[in-house]
Amino acid sequence: MLSDDDLKWLETPQPGWSPVRLPHMILEDSFVSGDSSGRRLSLRYFRHDPDRSLRARVIFGPGTQGPPGHAHGGSMAAVLDEAMGGAAWMQGHPVVAAELTARFKNMLPLGARCVVEAWVSAVDGRKVRVAGRLRQGDGDTAFAEGEAVFITLDPKKFGALTSEASRIFSELDEGRS
């Protein structure tokens, strides 16, 4: 269970960050961001306004444990995957992952407050290359870094997610989200 301080930290954006709901969050059981119990992953997404990249605040709960007292590398890779995909969606690319590389830098203690940063690094036709970093929330300690190649799909394949994405990001651009 998260403390009141943890919940406040998750919800409070840094200067230049705007809260955002990613399109997949309309799904109740999203693997990464669909845990309402706080036992697995607790995270909130933000747009970094100066460069329109994605930021997230995340706390890895006891349900992410791998090595005793530390987050499983797969949970760290899953957070990077979702954040990097979200960064592509925020730039107008409805994508799915084709390739993901994660490099683990340090063990991540359970309950640590972390920040995820993700940004589109290149677009080549249907391929969208994205990079990301998972770091300590109040410092520079890197826990993981990653790169991914996402493939843009026909928006019709995403059904309601596409219209939700258009609504969310137009509201964000108008300052309402």
Residue ranges of predicted features:
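Hydrophobic core residues within well-ordered beta-strands of beta-rich domains
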Residues: L41, R52-L54, C114, V128, ...
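HotDog/MaoC-like acyl-thioester-processing domains
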Residues: M1-L22, L108-L110, S121-S177
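Active-site helix/loop of acyl-thioester processing domains in fatty-acid/polyketide metabolism
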Residues: S53, G63, H70-V95
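Short beta-strand micro-motifs enriched in acidic
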Residues: F46-H48, W119-V123
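Catalytic strand-loop segment that frames the active site of acyl-thioester-processing enzymes
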Residues: M25-A71
